[in-house]
């Protein structure tokens, strides 16, 4: 999963997403400072660029997902309650950000389709905050029936470690969208995941 970093223009972002679309399974649109109109314009660009709606996840903005026909919404830890959204819009897939085992269990209880756990490693987007490490993933995988994705400081060299704790997937932000060559980085992550799965 590639997660946008809210640091680029809509046009720049659209070009990067279209370019990397075949190297990632999902693209999470996490543009907190953009207006509704800007994000809707971005989604129009992606549609014109051939990015399947099934690959797109909208962060937090339920209204945008509903208006654009996007089927997956990712809710922040302090965002809308999963259960309430599921009851009102049962056709949507819902992801939830969590930072510990109990948060993940509660998200699953409320009906989340997956959880995004972090931050796993030190990262520039969380400067000064101690990473949560990988141990909670091990705990989650023992009891959760929904997929657990890992985020935060994810680098190609760390893919194997995440595979070893049975994370179902990874989410990468700056490692792709802040990279000088996003397509090359996305391709490297894809190759690392494929190699880890062969072991």
Model-derived segments and their meaning:
Residues 119-120, 133, 153, 175-176:
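Residue-level preference for alpha-helix termini and adjacent loops
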Residues 1-114, 139, 145-146, 155-160, ...:
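Conserved N-terminal beta1-alpha1 strand-loop-helix module at the mouth
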Residues 63, 135, 171:
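Active-site phosphate/pyrophosphate-handling residues
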Residues 127-132, 137-138:
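Substrate-recognition "cap/lid" segment bordering the active-site pocket of phosphatases
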Residues 65, 121-127:
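A short acidic, helix-capping loop that chelates divalent metal ions and anchors anionic groups
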Residues 165-168:
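As written
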């Amino acid at each position: 999963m590639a997660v946008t970093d809210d640091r680029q223009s809509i046009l720049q972002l659209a070009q990067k997403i279209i370019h990397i679309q075949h190297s990632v399974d999902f693209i999470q649109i996490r543009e907190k400072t953009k207006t509704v109109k800007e994000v809707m314009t971005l989604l129009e660009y992606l549609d014109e660029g051939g990015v399947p709606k099934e690959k797109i996840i909208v962060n937090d903005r339920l209204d945008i997902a509903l208006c654009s026909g996007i089927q997956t919404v990712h809710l922040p830890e302090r965002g809308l309650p999963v259960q309430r959204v599921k009851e009102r819009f049962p056709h949507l897939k819902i992801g939830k950000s969590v930072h510990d085992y109990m948060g993940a269990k509660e998200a699953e209880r409320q009906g989340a389709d997956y959880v995004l756990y972090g931050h796993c490693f030190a990262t520039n987007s969380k400067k000064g905050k101690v990473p949560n490490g990988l141990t909670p993933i091990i705990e989650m995988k023992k009891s959760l029936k929904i997929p657990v994705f890992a985020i935060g400081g994810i680098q190609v060299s760390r893919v194997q470690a995440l595979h070893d704790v049975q994370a179902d997937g990874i989410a990468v932000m700056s490692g792709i969208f802040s990279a000088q060559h996003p397509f090359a980085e996305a391709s490297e992550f894809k190759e690392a995941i494929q190699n880890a799965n062969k072991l």
